[in-house]
């Protein structure tokens, strides 16, 4: 998938991108308890969202979705996120970072992934987190992952109209291979837990 993102970026924008990945997630224990300030036990999955990004010298940002095969342009000083459009998540994160004082510049973006949209694996959280990570690295913002997870949650709530909790973006930002995490949603403390199933596996139905 990383190669697909890189090649698509080269075709559309004739430049070399920074490529960043954020995973989707499953939840093993604690469904719907994150927005009740309870405990949850999510784990990252190998599928997720990839973004390719680079600065441009234009007056607009350009975003291309591999899944929808659409390009969308917007200006950083006049963003209008609207429900039901894939670019809402991009403009939502940019709006919140701008409001937090991060000096964004115009950029080109390609997004794609191998996670089913609407499949219950938090593709929207993975998109917001991957974009946040990419912007933070591209512009040397060094935004803490916890803050990125909170921005991703707020973006979905304010701009996509989804009453989501913190679990999805937090698991996407902090998930590690071979581990789940016990997350206390009261204070966002978490503990990584090794998941070694031996000869067994997990089947999601």
Model-derived segments and their meaning:
Residues 164-167, 171, 175-205:
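Mobile "lid/hinge" segments at catalytic clefts and subdomain interfaces of large enzymes
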